[in-house]
Amino acid sequence: MRCQHCHQNEATIRLNMQINSVHKQMVLCETCYNELTRKPSMSMGPQSFGFPFEQAFQPKEQSAAKQSEKKGLLDELAQNITNGAKAGLIDPVIGRDDEVARVIEILNRRNKNNPVLIGEPGVGKTAIAEGLALKIAEGDVPNKLKNKELYLLDVASLVANTGIRGQFEERMKQLITELKERKNVILFIDEIHLLVGAGSAEGSMDAGNILKPALARGELQVIGATTLKEYRQIEKDAALERRFQPVMVQEPSIEQAILILQGIKDKYEAYHGVTFSDEAIKACVTLSSRYIQDRHLPDKAIDLLDEAGSKANLLIDELNDEDAAERLTAIEAEKTKALEEENYELAAKLRDEELALEKKLNSSSAHTAVTVEAEHIQEIVEQKTGIPVGKLQADEQTKMKELEAKLHERVIGQEAAVQKVAKAVRRSRAGLKSKNRPVGSFLFVGPTGVGKTELSKTLADELFGTKDAIIRLDMSEYMEKHAVSKIIGSPPGYVGHEEAGQLTEKVRRNPYSIVLLDEIEKAHPDVQHMFLQIMEDGRLTDSQGRTVSFKDTVIIMTSNAGAGEKQTKVGFQSDDSVIEEQTLIDSLSMFFKPEFLNRFDSIIEFRSLEKEHLVKIVSLLLGELEETLAERGISLNVTDEAKEKIAELGYHPSFGARPLRRTIQEWVEDEMTDLLLDNGEITSFHVILEDDKIKVRAK
């Protein structure tokens, strides 16, 4: 019989033991018996006597195997990305060949071979490290990197449970020693700026300082990834910075982002059980690029893809085939048992359940996958941003053709102004404007009450689907020099620096808006200086250092400056429009600087309204009143004579159309109010002209 401890020599000693009230017997060779009885625990009394023999029951081969299975510190704190790449757990990396090649070049160096990936959040820095792991797994790397393994270090786990002084340094030293021994390991540290200051407390060394000597000599290799803003923390420590070689990661173009999504869509289709059409892939990129301004491609496009797949997956009444098959087997057994027991009622119920389950299983197998289309992506963008993307995308070409007619319906008597605005917007939508300039920048000049603000509201409704898409700033709030800072936020060191600017933050959140600055001549001249850059380059930097794009906004400023001045023309001149425009610019030059006026796409003069225009405006105002009454189930009928009388009563050459609203309130709405209070069961109102006076009749 062989020895139960070494399994090699013949057993010569039979040993009987009782350990913790359990009787055990084993056979040993003389060598193993002498080895076990010499252990110090043998002299520590009967309870500890059995301890070495308890271990003796385990074969030496097994204990050696356990030693080999024991993982090092690196395996506890880091994850092997290369193994994940070999197992197919990593998404394919597309369009980043140049960056991956640059990383491989740096890793191939003799010293300071530590690349750090720097770029904005969401541009794909971690994906480049995963791309390197895929290339290593495929063997598509130089000979020096053939057998390398890429480990992702968890910095939080590195610092955890190191509360006692010296524990962190000891753990770092152990990690560095292990990395020096395992020459085939490349350490990837995401958010590498966390190394600066990690683990330091009251004079102890931080992770960055501990790693410096090993990084400089090339004893271990590290790949880092961080954002531009957070890389400054590493730049403060010049000695640490020089040990890293920066690799800039730029945001991919729209074409590259589409290729990236087409490459990874198979993974998302398999996960969600849906299919993505090519139009949906394109919509993910184009819509996220256009409407989600504060994030970067391809991350924001992948988020849309994932969310659309998730939403479509929830609509599928999915049946698990394995569970259904197991239940069918169980039903068959239960049905057989019920028949044996002559329980025919239960057997009939089980038969019905079996038929229903088979039918559902067959329909599930024949079920075609749900396809995600571009419309689904539009719905998600609308939910995330609040921008009516569907309205903006639908029949845009037709909408642009009809823009001028739609504006004329609401803005009366300003044909030239409406025509100029419509032309500028159509030119922009056709892609003929400068890439970064706003859609249009206009200065509306004219007397009060002629439709300057109304044109802005109508334009917002036609362009962006809602009249609420207006960011309106009252220039009377910006008459003082110090108030100008409210537009972009207070500078550092001043109260309110943490708060966002009134204009920049609104445009950042709602880039598709009309910015309306009423009575611009009231504002301090510094406001004009601030808008010089917006109208020229379509961008403005707020007090937090964030650049806000105005390329999707329409800038409209209104002014009464010079509206009351008329110049007499002397002599003969065929082109009156040239003289009028020159006269207008000359009068505005008294209030605004030439460089400010020169940046507008168009300076539009609004004419004073004539009596015939006021009748149309009365019809519009009464139409609004009719809609209000319709909500209460009351109809309204107004004769043409009554409309003309209202226009006559409300006409004032200096005040424009605003007196009309007051006239309607005085002659129509007040009469209706009295009638409603006297008789609550009114179904219709008739406004007529009787004895040259406006009368309201109720039915």
UniProtKB/Swiss-Prot annotation:
Gene deletion effect: Cells lacking this gene display a retardation of CtsR-dependent gene induction as well as a delayed restoration of the repressed stage. They also show a significant delay in disaggregation of heat-generated insoluble protein aggregates.
Zinc fingers, C4-type class: 3-32
Statement: the UniProt record of this protein carries the keyword Metal-binding: yes
Function comment: ATPase essential both for efficient CtsR-dependent gene derepression during heat stress and for rerepression. Together with ClpP, degrades the global regulator CtsR after heat shock. Is also involved in disaggregation of heat-denatured proteins. Has thus a role in overall protein quality control in response to heat stress.
Protein modification: ClpE is a very short-lived protein, that is, at least in the soluble cell fraction, degraded mainly by ClpCP.
Up-regulation conditions: By heat shock via the relief of repression carried out by the transcriptional regulator CtsR.
Protein name as it appears in the record: ATP-dependent Clp protease ATP-binding subunit ClpE
Annotated ranges, domain UVR: 325-360
Residues binding ATP, per UniProt: 119-126, 446-453
Molecular function per GO: ATP binding; ATP hydrolysis activity; zinc ion binding
Subunit and partners: Interacts with ClpP.
This protein's UniProt keywords: ATP-binding, Chaperone, Metal-binding, Nucleotide-binding, Stress response, Zinc, Zinc-finger
Family matches, as Gene3D superfamilies: 1.10.8.60, P-loop containing nucleotide triphosphate hydrolases, UVR domain
Family (UniProt): Belongs to the ClpA/ClpB family. ClpE subfamily.
